[in-house]
């Protein structure tokens, strides 16, 4: 059996700066869609999926300012909701599984959220129906374009309504998406 021998007596000094985590920062980045105020986020990891999502947010009309390494400011005061239905969004959104996280904030603030069938990492079973079933419990109508593999939800004219929610499976991403959809009700 392998083992380590640790000889004490030497004090440790210094700082440890942990890198931001991809899955958490994708959720945080999408939350900027909930407000028109400027939001500053630090410790954003320089990872392909994170950079793709920042680019998608910019395509939506979010003003993105890079303040320094891992330090960005976002202002979502001129969102182009019609971007949801364009080919650019369908292509870019399909290449990033985390793009499902734009649905909740867009639904909450603009009354509609859509996503192409997402790609991204093929690790395990990660259902989308959990997200959409709960959006419907908040009063949203589910929309699916079969030929385009395009999913969406639209809020009723009188807006979303709070509801008691119990997910049929554990889902960190689903929970974050649902909280963002419900936060403005």
Residue ranges and their predicted role:
Residues 1-185:
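Structural preference for solvent-exposed beta-strand-turn elements
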């Amino acid at each position: 059996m392998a083992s380590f021998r640790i000889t004490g007596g030497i004090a440790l000094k210094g700082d440890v700066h942990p890198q931001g985590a991809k899955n958490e920062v994708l959720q945080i980045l999408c939350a900027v869609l909930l407000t028109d105020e400027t939001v500053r986020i630090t410790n954003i990891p320089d990872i392909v999926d994170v950079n793709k999502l920042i680019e998608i947010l910019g395509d939506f009309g979010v003003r993105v300012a890079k303040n320094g390494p891992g330090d960005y400011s976002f202002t979502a005061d001129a969102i182009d909701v019609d971007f949801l239905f364009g080919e650019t969004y369908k292509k870019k959104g399909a290449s990033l599984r985390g793009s499902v996280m734009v649905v909740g904030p867009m639904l909450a603030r603009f009354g509609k959220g859509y996503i192409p069938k997402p790609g991204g990492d093929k690790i395990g079973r990660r259902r989308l129906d959990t997200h959409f079933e709960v959006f419907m419990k908040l009063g949203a109508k589910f929309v699916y374009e079969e030929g385009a593999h395009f999913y969406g939800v639209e809020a009723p004219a009188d807006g979303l309504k709070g509801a008691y929610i119990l997910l049929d499976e554990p889902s960190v991403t689903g929970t974050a998406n649902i909280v963002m959809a419900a936060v403005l009700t």
